[in-house]
UniProtKB/Swiss-Prot annotation:
GO CC annotations on file: cytosol
Name of the protein: Metalloprotease TldD homolog
Phylogenetic classification of the source organism: Bacteria, Pseudomonadati, Pseudomonadota, Gammaproteobacteria, Enterobacterales
SUPFAM superfamilies: Putative modulator of DNA gyrase, PmbA/TldD
Gene3D superfamilies associated with the record: PmbA/TldD superfamily
Gene name as annotated: tldD
Length: 483
Protein backbone atom coordinates (compact mmCIF):
# COMPACT_ATOMS: atom_id res chain seq x y z
CA UNK A 1 0.00 0.00 0.00
CA UNK A 2 2.81 2.41 0.89
CA UNK A 3 4.59 1.79 -2.41
CA UNK A 4 1.47 2.47 -4.50
CA UNK A 5 0.75 5.70 -2.62
CA UNK A 6 4.30 6.98 -2.99
CA UNK A 7 4.54 5.97 -6.65
CA UNK A 8 1.31 7.78 -7.42
CA UNK A 9 2.38 10.91 -5.54
CA UNK A 10 6.02 11.17 -6.63
CA UNK A 11 6.01 9.57 -10.08
CA UNK A 12 2.59 9.25 -11.71
CA UNK A 13 1.33 12.65 -10.57
CA UNK A 14 4.44 14.17 -12.18
CA UNK A 15 4.03 12.18 -15.41
CA UNK A 16 6.95 9.84 -14.73
CA UNK A 17 6.59 6.06 -15.03
CA UNK A 18 8.72 3.06 -14.10
CA UNK A 19 10.23 2.91 -17.58
CA UNK A 20 11.38 6.53 -17.32
CA UNK A 21 13.13 5.67 -14.06
CA UNK A 22 14.80 2.63 -15.63
CA UNK A 23 15.98 4.67 -18.63
CA UNK A 24 17.51 7.27 -16.28
CA UNK A 25 19.44 4.52 -14.50
CA UNK A 26 20.55 3.13 -17.87
CA UNK A 27 21.82 6.60 -18.75
CA UNK A 28 23.92 6.61 -15.57
CA UNK A 29 25.42 3.30 -16.63
CA UNK A 30 26.85 4.76 -19.86
CA UNK A 31 29.74 5.65 -17.54
CA UNK A 32 31.74 3.09 -15.61
CA UNK A 33 29.95 3.08 -12.27
CA UNK A 34 30.14 1.08 -9.10
CA UNK A 35 26.71 2.30 -8.13
CA UNK A 36 24.09 4.91 -8.97
CA UNK A 37 20.71 5.91 -7.60
CA UNK A 38 17.75 8.24 -7.97
CA UNK A 39 16.17 9.75 -4.88
CA UNK A 40 12.67 11.25 -5.13
CA UNK A 41 11.34 13.14 -2.12
CA UNK A 42 8.40 15.29 -1.10
CA UNK A 43 8.28 16.93 2.30
CA UNK A 44 5.69 19.13 3.98
CA UNK A 45 6.31 20.77 7.32
CA UNK A 46 4.42 23.01 9.72
CA UNK A 47 5.33 24.77 12.93
CA UNK A 48 3.36 26.72 15.53
CA UNK A 49 5.05 28.93 18.12
CA UNK A 50 3.59 30.39 21.32
CA UNK A 51 5.26 33.27 23.15
CA UNK A 52 3.89 35.48 25.93
CA UNK A 53 0.59 33.55 25.95
CA UNK A 54 -0.17 34.24 22.28
CA UNK A 55 0.50 32.39 19.03
CA UNK A 56 3.35 34.32 17.45
CA UNK A 57 3.94 32.19 14.36
CA UNK A 58 2.28 29.60 12.21
CA UNK A 59 4.40 28.37 9.32
CA UNK A 60 3.86 25.92 6.49
CA UNK A 61 6.50 24.77 4.02
CA UNK A 62 6.50 22.24 1.21
CA UNK A 63 9.40 21.00 -0.86
CA UNK A 64 9.95 18.29 -3.45
CA UNK A 65 12.78 17.26 -5.69
CA UNK A 66 15.11 14.68 -7.16
CA UNK A 67 18.69 13.80 -6.26
CA UNK A 68 20.78 11.78 -8.74
CA UNK A 69 24.04 10.12 -7.74
CA UNK A 70 26.72 8.32 -9.76
CA UNK A 71 29.62 6.65 -7.91
CA UNK A 72 32.92 5.25 -9.13
CA UNK A 73 35.59 4.48 -6.57
CA UNK A 74 35.69 7.41 -4.18
CA UNK A 75 34.35 9.82 -6.82
CA UNK A 76 30.71 10.87 -6.75
CA UNK A 77 28.79 12.72 -9.42
CA UNK A 78 25.74 14.38 -7.90
CA UNK A 79 23.02 16.65 -9.22
CA UNK A 80 19.60 17.60 -7.95
CA UNK A 81 16.51 19.53 -8.94
CA UNK A 82 13.85 21.16 -6.79
CA UNK A 83 11.22 19.99 -9.24
CA UNK A 84 9.94 16.49 -9.90
CA UNK A 85 9.37 16.16 -13.63
CA UNK A 86 10.61 14.00 -16.49
CA UNK A 87 12.68 16.90 -17.80
CA UNK A 88 14.36 17.59 -14.44
CA UNK A 89 15.04 13.86 -14.03
CA UNK A 90 16.76 13.72 -17.41
CA UNK A 91 18.79 16.89 -16.85
CA UNK A 92 19.91 15.83 -13.36
CA UNK A 93 20.89 12.40 -14.65
CA UNK A 94 23.03 13.86 -17.44
CA UNK A 95 24.71 16.29 -15.05
CA UNK A 96 25.48 13.62 -12.43
CA UNK A 97 26.89 11.06 -14.83
CA UNK A 98 28.94 13.63 -16.77
CA UNK A 99 31.15 14.12 -13.71
CA UNK A 100 32.29 10.49 -14.01
CA UNK A 101 34.74 10.75 -16.93
CA UNK A 102 35.30 7.07 -17.75
CA UNK A 103 32.81 5.78 -20.31
CA UNK A 104 31.29 2.36 -19.84
CA UNK A 105 28.67 -0.01 -21.14
CA UNK A 106 27.23 -1.33 -17.91
CA UNK A 107 23.63 -2.30 -17.46
CA UNK A 108 21.32 -1.54 -14.60
CA UNK A 109 19.54 -4.52 -13.15
CA UNK A 110 15.84 -4.87 -13.85
CA UNK A 111 13.98 -2.85 -11.25
CA UNK A 112 12.33 -4.97 -8.60
CA UNK A 113 9.69 -3.38 -6.39
CA UNK A 114 10.44 -4.41 -2.83
CA UNK A 115 7.79 -4.35 -0.14
CA UNK A 116 9.27 -3.28 3.18
CA UNK A 117 7.22 -3.75 6.33
CA UNK A 118 6.73 -0.21 7.71
CA UNK A 119 7.56 0.42 11.36
CA UNK A 120 5.29 3.45 11.64
CA UNK A 121 1.78 4.14 10.41
CA UNK A 122 0.95 6.00 7.23
CA UNK A 123 -0.49 9.07 8.92
CA UNK A 124 -0.15 12.70 7.90
CA UNK A 125 -0.01 14.69 11.16
CA UNK A 126 -0.73 17.94 9.33
CA UNK A 127 -4.18 16.71 8.32
CA UNK A 128 -5.42 15.07 11.51
CA UNK A 129 -6.00 18.22 13.61
CA UNK A 130 -7.51 21.58 12.73
CA UNK A 131 -5.43 24.73 13.18
CA UNK A 132 -7.42 25.52 16.32
CA UNK A 133 -6.80 22.06 17.77
CA UNK A 134 -3.07 22.47 17.15
CA UNK A 135 -2.85 25.89 18.77
CA UNK A 136 -5.03 24.66 21.64
CA UNK A 137 -2.25 22.21 22.48
CA UNK A 138 0.12 25.15 22.96
CA UNK A 139 -2.43 27.14 24.97
CA UNK A 140 -2.97 24.09 27.16
CA UNK A 141 0.76 23.79 27.88
CA UNK A 142 0.98 27.52 28.58
CA UNK A 143 -1.93 27.38 31.03
CA UNK A 144 -0.56 24.36 32.89
CA UNK A 145 2.92 25.85 33.24
CA UNK A 146 1.71 29.25 34.44
CA UNK A 147 -0.82 27.79 36.87
CA UNK A 148 1.78 25.68 38.67
CA UNK A 149 3.73 28.48 40.31
CA UNK A 150 3.51 32.28 40.52
CA UNK A 151 7.24 32.49 39.82
CA UNK A 152 6.73 31.41 36.22
CA UNK A 153 7.20 34.62 34.22
CA UNK A 154 7.67 33.31 30.68
CA UNK A 155 6.50 30.31 28.68
CA UNK A 156 7.62 29.55 25.13
CA UNK A 157 6.25 26.49 23.38
CA UNK A 158 6.39 25.08 19.87
CA UNK A 159 4.62 22.37 17.91
CA UNK A 160 6.00 20.91 14.68
CA UNK A 161 4.79 18.24 12.31
CA UNK A 162 6.04 16.86 9.03
CA UNK A 163 5.08 14.31 6.41
CA UNK A 164 7.70 12.93 4.06
CA UNK A 165 7.51 10.56 1.12
CA UNK A 166 10.61 9.07 -0.50
CA UNK A 167 11.32 6.68 -3.35
CA UNK A 168 14.75 5.22 -4.14
CA UNK A 169 15.66 3.54 -7.44
CA UNK A 170 19.18 2.16 -7.88
CA UNK A 171 21.39 0.49 -10.46
CA UNK A 172 21.42 -2.68 -8.37
CA UNK A 173 17.74 -3.12 -9.19
CA UNK A 174 16.09 -1.84 -6.03
CA UNK A 175 12.91 0.22 -6.18
CA UNK A 176 11.67 0.99 -2.66
CA UNK A 177 9.67 3.66 -0.88
CA UNK A 178 8.84 5.00 2.55
CA UNK A 179 6.37 7.36 4.20
CA UNK A 180 7.71 9.15 7.28
CA UNK A 181 5.50 11.12 9.67
CA UNK A 182 7.15 13.10 12.46
CA UNK A 183 5.92 15.31 15.29
CA UNK A 184 7.57 17.23 18.11
CA UNK A 185 6.56 19.46 21.01
CA UNK A 186 8.93 21.56 23.10
CA UNK A 187 8.42 23.94 25.99
CA UNK A 188 10.76 26.37 27.74
CA UNK A 189 9.85 28.01 31.05
CA UNK A 190 11.54 30.96 32.76
CA UNK A 191 11.06 31.46 36.50
CA UNK A 192 12.12 34.34 38.72
CA UNK A 193 12.46 34.71 42.48
CA UNK A 194 13.92 37.82 44.12
CA UNK A 195 15.71 38.85 40.94
CA UNK A 196 17.19 35.41 40.31
CA UNK A 197 16.16 33.67 37.09
CA UNK A 198 16.43 30.10 35.83
CA UNK A 199 15.06 28.23 32.83
CA UNK A 200 13.72 24.71 32.39
CA UNK A 201 12.98 22.79 29.18
CA UNK A 202 11.11 19.66 28.23
CA UNK A 203 9.26 18.05 25.34
CA UNK A 204 9.04 15.01 23.13
CA UNK A 205 8.00 13.57 19.81
CA UNK A 206 7.40 10.47 17.73
CA UNK A 207 6.68 9.14 14.24
CA UNK A 208 2.90 9.38 14.45
CA UNK A 209 0.23 12.11 14.67
CA UNK A 210 -0.64 14.81 17.22
CA UNK A 211 -2.91 12.47 19.20
CA UNK A 212 0.34 11.19 20.69
CA UNK A 213 0.58 14.35 22.79
CA UNK A 214 -2.87 13.78 24.31
CA UNK A 215 -2.23 10.14 25.16
CA UNK A 216 -0.96 8.95 28.52
CA UNK A 217 2.76 8.49 29.00
CA UNK A 218 3.64 4.98 30.18
CA UNK A 219 6.07 6.05 32.91
CA UNK A 220 4.46 9.21 34.32
CA UNK A 221 0.85 8.03 33.79
CA UNK A 222 0.01 11.60 32.74
CA UNK A 223 -1.08 13.15 29.46
CA UNK A 224 2.24 13.69 27.67
CA UNK A 225 1.87 17.39 26.96
CA UNK A 226 0.79 17.99 30.57
CA UNK A 227 3.73 16.00 31.89
CA UNK A 228 6.29 17.89 29.79
CA UNK A 229 4.82 21.25 30.81
CA UNK A 230 5.14 20.29 34.47
CA UNK A 231 8.67 18.97 33.90
CA UNK A 232 9.84 22.27 32.42
CA UNK A 233 8.54 24.13 35.48
CA UNK A 234 10.02 21.57 37.87
CA UNK A 235 13.50 21.84 36.35
CA UNK A 236 13.39 25.65 36.30
CA UNK A 237 12.36 25.82 39.98
CA UNK A 238 14.91 23.17 40.90
CA UNK A 239 17.69 25.29 39.43
CA UNK A 240 16.50 28.28 41.46
CA UNK A 241 17.46 26.39 44.60
CA UNK A 242 20.52 24.66 43.15
CA UNK A 243 24.00 25.33 44.46
CA UNK A 244 27.03 26.00 42.28
CA UNK A 245 28.88 22.85 41.26
CA UNK A 246 32.30 21.92 42.57
CA UNK A 247 35.28 21.37 40.28
CA UNK A 248 37.47 18.30 40.46
CA UNK A 249 37.57 14.61 39.63
CA UNK A 250 34.69 12.56 41.04
CA UNK A 251 32.60 9.47 40.34
CA UNK A 252 29.60 10.35 38.17
CA UNK A 253 26.25 8.58 38.00
CA UNK A 254 24.42 9.17 34.72
CA UNK A 255 20.64 8.94 34.64
CA UNK A 256 18.73 6.82 32.13
CA UNK A 257 17.34 8.13 28.85
CA UNK A 258 18.56 11.45 27.45
CA UNK A 259 22.03 11.27 29.11
CA UNK A 260 22.68 8.76 26.33
CA UNK A 261 23.47 11.86 24.28
CA UNK A 262 26.96 11.53 25.75
CA UNK A 263 27.26 8.08 24.14
CA UNK A 264 25.78 9.43 20.92
CA UNK A 265 28.28 12.26 20.64
CA UNK A 266 31.42 10.86 22.26
CA UNK A 267 31.08 7.28 20.98
CA UNK A 268 28.46 7.07 18.22
CA UNK A 269 29.93 9.53 15.75
CA UNK A 270 33.31 7.87 16.12
CA UNK A 271 31.73 4.60 14.93
CA UNK A 272 30.42 6.03 11.65
CA UNK A 273 32.04 4.41 8.64
CA UNK A 274 33.28 7.49 6.80
CA UNK A 275 35.38 8.70 9.73
CA UNK A 276 36.93 5.25 10.11
CA UNK A 277 37.60 4.75 6.41
CA UNK A 278 39.44 8.07 6.37
CA UNK A 279 41.29 7.24 9.58
CA UNK A 280 40.00 10.30 11.45
CA UNK A 281 38.17 8.46 14.25
CA UNK A 282 39.66 7.40 17.54
CA UNK A 283 38.10 3.97 16.80
CA UNK A 284 39.87 3.47 13.44
CA UNK A 285 41.26 -0.08 12.98
CA UNK A 286 39.87 -1.22 16.33
CA UNK A 287 37.32 -3.82 15.18
CA UNK A 288 37.65 -6.83 17.47
CA UNK A 289 39.47 -4.88 20.15
CA UNK A 290 38.30 -3.98 23.64
CA UNK A 291 37.19 -0.35 23.61
CA UNK A 292 34.89 -0.28 26.64
CA UNK A 293 34.05 -1.92 29.93
CA UNK A 294 32.76 -5.48 29.53
CA UNK A 295 29.50 -4.15 30.99
CA UNK A 296 28.88 -2.18 27.78
CA UNK A 297 26.86 -3.35 24.81
CA UNK A 298 25.93 -0.50 22.47
CA UNK A 299 23.39 -0.84 19.70
CA UNK A 300 22.15 1.30 16.83
CA UNK A 301 18.64 0.20 15.95
CA UNK A 302 16.54 1.76 13.20
CA UNK A 303 13.67 -0.68 13.70
CA UNK A 304 12.14 0.49 17.00
CA UNK A 305 8.45 1.17 16.39
CA UNK A 306 7.57 4.89 16.20
CA UNK A 307 10.91 5.98 17.68
CA UNK A 308 12.16 9.31 16.35
CA UNK A 309 15.28 7.90 14.68
CA UNK A 310 13.60 4.83 13.20
CA UNK A 311 13.55 4.11 9.47
CA UNK A 312 11.67 1.46 7.52
CA UNK A 313 14.42 2.01 4.93
CA UNK A 314 17.40 4.32 5.00
CA UNK A 315 17.90 6.97 2.32
CA UNK A 316 19.65 4.50 0.02
CA UNK A 317 16.82 1.98 0.17
CA UNK A 318 18.48 -0.42 2.63
CA UNK A 319 16.00 -1.75 5.24
CA UNK A 320 16.44 -0.41 8.76
CA UNK A 321 18.54 -2.74 10.89
CA UNK A 322 19.51 -3.50 14.46
CA UNK A 323 23.31 -3.29 14.62
CA UNK A 324 25.42 -4.36 17.59
CA UNK A 325 28.30 -1.88 17.54
CA UNK A 326 30.03 -2.80 20.81
CA UNK A 327 29.34 -6.10 22.56
CA UNK A 328 30.58 -6.71 26.10
CA UNK A 329 33.20 -4.03 25.51
CA UNK A 330 34.45 -5.40 22.15
CA UNK A 331 34.06 -3.26 19.01
CA UNK A 332 32.07 -5.32 16.49
CA UNK A 333 31.28 -3.05 13.56
CA UNK A 334 30.95 0.47 12.20
CA UNK A 335 27.76 2.07 10.89
CA UNK A 336 27.85 2.14 7.09
CA UNK A 337 26.22 3.62 4.04
CA UNK A 338 26.70 1.96 0.64
CA UNK A 339 29.67 4.07 -0.48
CA UNK A 340 31.83 3.57 2.59
CA UNK A 341 30.73 -0.04 3.03
CA UNK A 342 31.86 -0.90 -0.50
CA UNK A 343 35.20 0.85 -0.05
CA UNK A 344 35.76 -0.98 3.25
CA UNK A 345 34.67 -4.37 1.90
CA UNK A 346 31.56 -4.77 4.04
CA UNK A 347 27.79 -4.40 3.63
CA UNK A 348 25.64 -1.37 4.35
CA UNK A 349 24.17 -1.45 7.84
CA UNK A 350 21.10 0.63 6.91
CA UNK A 351 22.68 3.87 8.14
CA UNK A 352 22.85 5.81 4.86
CA UNK A 353 20.95 9.00 5.68
CA UNK A 354 20.45 12.43 4.16
CA UNK A 355 18.53 15.53 5.16
CA UNK A 356 16.93 15.96 1.73
CA UNK A 357 17.20 15.25 -1.98
CA UNK A 358 19.70 18.13 -2.27
CA UNK A 359 22.19 16.40 0.06
CA UNK A 360 24.44 13.38 -0.33
CA UNK A 361 23.81 10.44 2.02
CA UNK A 362 26.43 9.54 4.60
CA UNK A 363 26.73 7.13 7.55
CA UNK A 364 24.51 8.41 10.36
CA UNK A 365 23.01 7.04 13.55
CA UNK A 366 19.34 6.08 13.96
CA UNK A 367 18.42 5.11 17.56
CA UNK A 368 21.62 4.55 19.53
CA UNK A 369 21.55 3.11 23.03
CA UNK A 370 23.29 0.93 25.61
CA UNK A 371 21.68 -2.26 26.87
CA UNK A 372 20.61 -2.59 30.49
CA UNK A 373 22.84 -4.14 33.11
CA UNK A 374 21.93 -5.78 36.41
CA UNK A 375 22.38 -3.00 38.99
CA UNK A 376 19.60 -1.03 40.67
CA UNK A 377 19.83 2.77 40.53
CA UNK A 378 19.60 2.94 44.33
CA UNK A 379 22.59 0.63 44.64
CA UNK A 380 24.57 2.68 42.13
CA UNK A 381 23.88 5.84 44.16
CA UNK A 382 24.78 4.08 47.42
CA UNK A 383 28.15 3.05 45.99
CA UNK A 384 29.27 6.70 45.67
CA UNK A 385 30.85 8.37 48.71
CA UNK A 386 31.19 11.75 47.04
CA UNK A 387 30.21 12.50 43.46
CA UNK A 388 27.67 13.77 40.95
CA UNK A 389 24.32 12.41 39.77
CA UNK A 390 23.73 13.84 36.27
CA UNK A 391 20.06 13.31 35.43
CA UNK A 392 19.90 15.33 32.23
CA UNK A 393 22.03 17.29 29.78
CA UNK A 394 21.47 20.57 27.98
CA UNK A 395 24.20 20.26 25.35
CA UNK A 396 27.78 19.42 24.56
CA UNK A 397 30.64 19.27 22.09
CA UNK A 398 32.92 16.47 20.91
CA UNK A 399 36.01 16.16 18.74
CA UNK A 400 35.66 13.04 16.57
CA UNK A 401 39.40 12.59 16.04
CA UNK A 402 40.43 12.74 19.69
CA UNK A 403 37.13 11.66 21.22
CA UNK A 404 37.34 14.49 23.75
CA UNK A 405 34.04 15.98 24.91
CA UNK A 406 32.49 18.64 27.12
CA UNK A 407 28.86 18.29 28.25
CA UNK A 408 26.70 20.57 30.38
CA UNK A 409 23.99 19.28 32.70
CA UNK A 410 20.49 20.71 32.96
CA UNK A 411 19.64 18.69 36.07
CA UNK A 412 22.27 17.35 38.47
CA UNK A 413 22.72 16.54 42.16
CA UNK A 414 25.54 16.16 44.64
CA UNK A 415 25.95 12.70 46.18
CA UNK A 416 27.40 12.33 49.69
CA UNK A 417 27.79 9.08 51.60
CA UNK A 418 25.62 7.22 49.13
CA UNK A 419 22.75 9.71 49.28
CA UNK A 420 21.49 12.48 47.01
CA UNK A 421 21.82 15.63 49.13
CA UNK A 422 21.34 18.76 47.02
CA UNK A 423 20.73 19.94 43.45
CA UNK A 424 23.69 21.61 41.70
CA UNK A 425 24.00 23.69 38.54
CA UNK A 426 26.60 24.94 36.05
CA UNK A 427 28.07 21.45 35.96
CA UNK A 428 30.16 20.28 33.02
CA UNK A 429 31.51 16.79 32.34
CA UNK A 430 34.89 16.70 30.62
CA UNK A 431 36.63 13.66 29.20
CA UNK A 432 37.38 11.34 26.29
CA UNK A 433 34.88 8.89 24.85
CA UNK A 434 37.36 6.02 24.84
CA UNK A 435 38.41 6.69 28.45
CA UNK A 436 34.85 7.09 29.69
CA UNK A 437 33.80 3.75 28.22
CA UNK A 438 36.57 2.04 30.17
CA UNK A 439 35.48 3.76 33.40
CA UNK A 440 31.95 2.32 33.47
CA UNK A 441 31.82 0.21 36.62
CA UNK A 442 28.07 -0.29 37.15
CA UNK A 443 25.17 -0.39 34.67
CA UNK A 444 21.54 -0.12 35.74
CA UNK A 445 18.62 -2.34 34.80
CA UNK A 446 16.54 0.66 33.72
CA UNK A 447 17.18 1.25 30.00
CA UNK A 448 15.08 4.15 28.76
CA UNK A 449 14.88 5.85 25.38
CA UNK A 450 14.67 9.63 25.17
CA UNK A 451 11.33 11.40 24.78
CA UNK A 452 11.82 12.06 21.06
CA UNK A 453 13.71 15.35 20.90
CA UNK A 454 16.95 14.26 19.25
CA UNK A 455 18.31 16.16 16.26
CA UNK A 456 21.79 15.28 15.03
CA UNK A 457 23.96 17.57 12.91
CA UNK A 458 26.80 16.46 10.66
CA UNK A 459 28.38 18.28 7.72
CA UNK A 460 25.49 20.76 7.67
CA UNK A 461 22.77 18.09 7.56
CA UNK A 462 20.26 17.75 10.42
CA UNK A 463 18.32 14.53 10.90
CA UNK A 464 16.07 13.07 13.64
CA UNK A 465 17.69 10.50 15.95
CA UNK A 466 16.86 8.53 19.06
CA UNK A 467 19.05 8.22 22.15
CA UNK A 468 18.91 5.96 25.17
CA UNK A 469 20.74 4.25 27.99
CA UNK A 470 20.27 2.80 31.47
CA UNK A 471 21.68 4.59 34.50
CA UNK A 472 25.40 3.94 34.98
CA UNK A 473 28.39 4.80 37.13
CA UNK A 474 31.57 6.34 35.73
CA UNK A 475 34.68 6.26 37.90
CA UNK A 476 36.65 9.49 38.30
CA UNK A 477 35.41 11.86 35.61
CA UNK A 478 36.60 15.46 35.44
CA UNK A 479 33.90 17.91 36.56
CA UNK A 480 33.99 21.56 35.69
CA UNK A 481 32.09 23.84 38.06
CA UNK A 482 32.19 27.36 39.45
CA UNK A 483 33.41 26.55 42.95
Amino acid sequence: MTFELVTESLLNANKINDQDVFIALEELCTRQLDYGDLYFQSHIHESWILENSIIKEGNYHSDAGIGVRAIRGESTGFAYSDQISLDSLRRSTKKAHSIILTKGSGKTKTLSKKTIEPIYKNVNPLEGFSSKEKTDLLYRANYIARSLDHRVIEVNASLTGSYEQILVASTDGNLVSDIRPSIQFSISVLVEDHGKRERGRSGGGSRTDYNFFLNQDDSSKEIRIDHWSKEAVRIALLNLSSKEALSGTFPVVLGSGWPGVLLHEAIGHGLEGDFNRKGTSIFTNMIGKKVASELCTIIDDGTIKNQRGSLSIDDEGTPGQKNILIENGILKKYMQDKLNARLMGVKSTGNGRRESYSCLPMPRMTNTYMLSGKSKLDDIIKSVDYGIYAVNFSGGQVDITSGKFVFSTSEAYLIKNGKIVTPIKNTTLIGSGLEVMQKISMVGDDLKMDEGMGICGKDGQNIPVGIGQPSMKLENLTIGGTV
